[in-house]
């Protein structure tokens, strides 16, 4: 059987499948190259994102080869391999998305000083747990060719949801709760007067939740389609949405990661526009991006008002937590007695600490006794960049 069988619906689905696979691989590769080239981006959160992209790429590459060679249609080892790649790879990507939500929550809300200590558990969870579903799928002999790929057969609806879509809904629900708690925390901080740039904080809030929105949108049609398939209905439009969006999750997640990080889109913007400068186009824009590609957004610490330790209605005030308008920066100011216990923390993974005396603070203390005291603060930056020194 050839790659195209003459059925318009199947051919459309196949073309979208290949397009989604290739775009997903390119997107993930771009993010990995960005993390490799830009040392400023090397922190705990970006390590989690890199693991997601690496997992997605390793899922999409063999899937693309199997689709192009059309060997899975005859069953046997290629068909089983295709089913393994889909089940294990997709499950692992979901879990890395959950770990990203956990990391951001721990850094912003819980102010975890050493988030990298959880990484070994992330590896075990994300690359170990999917083995269970994969082994059960193979042991129960549920694998069949189901259209454009091999997976759990149509007659095994219970296994489809028990081994795959049930865990997806559970993982997404936990991720959504963590993102909601993080967004609520930053919302309270912002509305307690944390910044003079409140009009930009809508963008900040969006960057905190957009990756989980992408996660849901890319897989919700797959869930709906499998429910409909369980009712012995196979609408072509729903199948096409399922095929493209679920397979292209890596691409849209990569677009989100690049959008959330000014360093990365400046870097790629400068590289892309270099081609056009040979023809005299976008010269000024390219020079501006090239000049600023290693510039992070200004640290919120630069507009610090000092520490007060006050709370408002049980919530942190603007003096306790300061968030910039971009997701990649959020500084949390702590009291001296909290900072003294953490002066030896490792700064390599997005934990940048600045201990300044009163003379370098942006706010001055009124009484002479207060002027003699040292105000110590800690800046913690989260997400996809650090505001430190580094080389391209």
From Swiss-Prot:
Glycosylated position list: 10
Location, primary (coarse class): membrane
UniProt keywords, alphabetically: G-protein coupled receptor, Glycoprotein, Membrane, Phosphoprotein, Receptor, Transducer, Transmembrane, Transmembrane helix
GO MF: adenylate cyclase activator activity; cAMP binding; cAMP receptor activity; G protein-coupled chemoattractant receptor activity; G protein-coupled receptor activity; GTPase regulator activity; pathogen-derived receptor ligand activity; protein kinase activator activity
SUPFAM superfamilies from the UniProt entry: Family A G protein-coupled receptor-like (SSF81321)
Cytoplasmic topological intervals: 34-47, 110-120, 182-205, 261-392
Outcome when changing residue 136 to A: In DN1; constitutive phosphorylation and greatly increased affinity for cAMP
Database matches in Gene3D superfamilies: Rhodopsin 7-helix transmembrane proteins (1.20.1070.10)
Residues modified as Phosphoserine: 299, 302-304, 308, 360-364, 366-368
Keyword rRNA-binding: no
Side Extracellular, residues: 1-13, 69-83, 140-162, 225-235
Membrane topology note: Multi-pass membrane protein
Outcome of substituting residue 100 to H: In DN3; constitutive phosphorylation and greatly increased affinity for cAMP
One Gene Ontology term from the biological process aspect of the record: response to curcumin
Positions of transmembrane segments: 14-33, 48-68, 84-109, 121-139, 163-181, 206-224, 236-260
Modification comment: C-terminal Ser or Thr residues may be phosphorylated.
Effect of residue 156 to Y: Reduces the affinity for cAMP by 100 to 1000-fold
Superkingdom classification of source: Eukaryota
Region (Disordered): 292-324, 339-392
Pfam families registered for this protein in UniProt: Dicty_CAR
GO terms under cellular component: cell leading edge; cell surface; cytosol; early endosome; plasma membrane
Outcome of swapping residue 225 to D: In DN2; constitutive phosphorylation and greatly increased affinity for cAMP
Role noted for this protein: Receptor for cAMP. Coordinates the aggregation of individual cells into a multicellular organism and regulates the expression of a large number of developmentally regulated genes. The activity of this receptor is mediated by G proteins.
PANTHER family named in the record: CYCLIC AMP RECEPTOR 1-RELATED (PTHR23112:SF23), G PROTEIN-COUPLED RECEPTOR 157-RELATED (PTHR23112)
Name listed for the protein in its UniProt record: Cyclic AMP receptor 1
Lineage, uppermost ranks: Eukaryota, Amoebozoa, Evosea, Eumycetozoa, Dictyostelia
Gene name linked to the record: carA-1
């Amino acid at each position: 059987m050839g790659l195209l069988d003459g059925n318009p619906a199947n051919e459309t689905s196949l073309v979208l499948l290949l397009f989604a696979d290739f775009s997903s691989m390119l997107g993930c590769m771009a993010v990995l190259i960005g993390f490799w080239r830009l040392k400023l981006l090397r922190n705990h959160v970006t390590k989690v994102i890199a693991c997601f992209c690496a997992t997605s790429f390793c899922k999409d590459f063999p899937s693309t080869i199997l689709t192009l060679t059309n060997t899975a249609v005859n069953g046997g080892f290629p068909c089983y391999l295709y089913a393994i790649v889909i089940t294990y790879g997709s499950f692992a990507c979901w879990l890395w998305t959950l770990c990203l939500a956990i990391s951001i929550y721990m850094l912003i809300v819980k102010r975890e000083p050493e988030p990298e200590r959880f990484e070994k558990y992330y590896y075990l969870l994300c690359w170990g747990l999917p083995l269970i579903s994969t082994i059960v799928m193979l042991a129960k002999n549920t694998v069949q060719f189901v259209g454009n790929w091999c997976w759990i057969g149509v007659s095994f609806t219970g296994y489809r949801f028990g081994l795959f879509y049930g865990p997806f809904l559970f993982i997404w629900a936990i991720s959504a709760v963590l993102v909601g708690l993080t967004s609520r925390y930053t919302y309270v901080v912002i509305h307690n007067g944390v910044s003079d740039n409140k009009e930009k904080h809508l963008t900040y809030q969006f960057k905190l939740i957009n990756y989980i929105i992408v996660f849901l949108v890319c897989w919700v049609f797959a869930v709906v389609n499998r429910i409909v398939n369980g009712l012995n209905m196979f609408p072509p439009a729903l199948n096409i949405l399922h095929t493209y969006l679920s397979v292209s999750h890596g691409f849209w997640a990569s677009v989100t990661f690049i959008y959330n990080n000014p360093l990365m889109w400046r870097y790629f913007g400068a590289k892309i526009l270099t081609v056009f400068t040979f023809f005299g186009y976008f010269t000024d824009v390219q020079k501006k991006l090239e000049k600023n590609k290693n510039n992070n957004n200004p640290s919120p610490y630069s507009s610090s008002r000092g520490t007060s330790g006050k709370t408002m209605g049980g919530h942190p005030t603007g003096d306790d937590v300061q968030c910039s308008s971009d997701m990649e920066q959020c500084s949390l100011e702590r009291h001296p007695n909290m900072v003294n216990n953490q002066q030896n923390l490792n700064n390599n993974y997005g934990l940048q600490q600045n201990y300044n005396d009163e003379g370098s603070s942006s706010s001055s203390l009124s009484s002479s006794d207060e002027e003699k005291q040292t105000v110590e603060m800690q800046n913690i930056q989260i997400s996809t960049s650090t505001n430190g020194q580094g080389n391209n």
